């Protein structure tokens, strides 16, 4: 093929390795809660350094609070779950943004893994960009016809494909 696109998400490092290329990934687990009532009409976002539960987003008849961020091992990425501790953290931090969350029913809890490109100076992963990363391996590694696209958030994966394929 004249061009191979590695869009393997959190498994992208393994695909790149098959081509003799090193892509250091940072598997960042994130959890969020969906509530059964829309309690805000605009996005509420804390003006602070990135942290857990710093955004409350309205949508139709619901709202969501999120997210958490923690590094997980590659052996855990296929089976991430929202923990009771994460629920407690999201609730306690979310109630600081909107006290009404204390009495709003949780409909669902979601967890996923962000396929972030690792940064040497950020072992926590909190300051790694959540933006889309396009690695041209001809420029970067001398391997023509091979690119890796990764990063982003679970909710933007379709935008990634639309913008770069």
Q: Where do the language-model regions lie?
A:
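Core beta-strand elements of the Rossmann-like FAD/NAD(P) dinucleotide-binding domain
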Residues: 1-3, 7
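C-terminal catalytic lobe of FAD-dependent flavoproteins
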Residues: 3, 14-17, 21-31, 35-64, ...
């Amino acid at each position: 093929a004249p061009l191979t696109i590695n869009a393997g998400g959190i498994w992208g490092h393994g695909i790149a390795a098959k081509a003799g290329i090193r892509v250091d990934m940072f598997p960042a687990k994130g959890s969020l809660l969906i509530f059964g009532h829309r309690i805000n009409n605009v996005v509420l976002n804390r003006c602070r350094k990135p942290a857990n539960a710093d955004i409350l987003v309205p949508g139709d008849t619901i709202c969501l609070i999120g997210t958490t961020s923690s590094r997980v091992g590659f052996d855990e990425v296929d089976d991430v779950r929202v923990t009771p501790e994460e629920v407690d953290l999201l609730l306690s931090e979310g109630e600081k943004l909107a006290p009404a969350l204390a009495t709003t029913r949780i409909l669902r809890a979601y967890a996923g893994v962000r396929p972030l490109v690792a940064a040497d100076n950020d072992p926590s992963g909190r300051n790694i960009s959540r933006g889309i990363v396009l690695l041209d391996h001809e420029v970067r590694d001398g391997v023509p016809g091979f690119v890796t696209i990764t990063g982003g958030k679970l909710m933007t994966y379709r935008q990634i494909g639309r913008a770069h394929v």
